[in-house]
Amino acid sequence: HHYISANKQFGKTMQDDITDGVNYLIDQGVADADRIAIFGGSYGGYATMAGLTFTPDLYAAGINFVGVVDLELLQEDSNRNSRRFGGFYDELRLEWGDPDDPEDMEYIIETSPLRQAHKIKSPVLIIHGAQDNNVRLVHARKLADKLDSLGKEYEWYVEPYEGHGFSGEQSTLNMFGKVEEFLAKHLKN
């Protein structure tokens, strides 16, 4: 039931849980409201961008690691992969909405960070593996292009030989070095 209850709640109640957690930590004095960053990979990258988009005053910075940002492109990819790998990818239509259904398409547009990027106020570090077949590099490129067109601040880091998550020791060290620099720059005292 918990899994099914998440259907069409990406960017909605699922995101509200993250926001509620952050606000709780602020209220408890655990987190400094002026120095909060959000960092996630894959779906967590989507959640990062949703946080920066739908609650732009909550975060000082965000790190999107191999994250989904274009829900329409995700649907196209799921259709392609569904033909290749079978019905598993059909579940994405239940989770993220069916672009052939006008009501679902409204949800897709409303919850797509790429479509709502104009709301972003904080700097973003975009990290991706050029060989990612799950969330293709085009997601990161489209986000960078959109942020450029909007004059938004972002940094870009792509590992040429990594995929959906980094497994190489050196590329992982390089990535976390970039993360450390980015956070030090944007979460100063």
Predicted regions and their residues:
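Active-site-proximal cap/loop segments of hydrolase catalytic domains
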Residues: 1-189
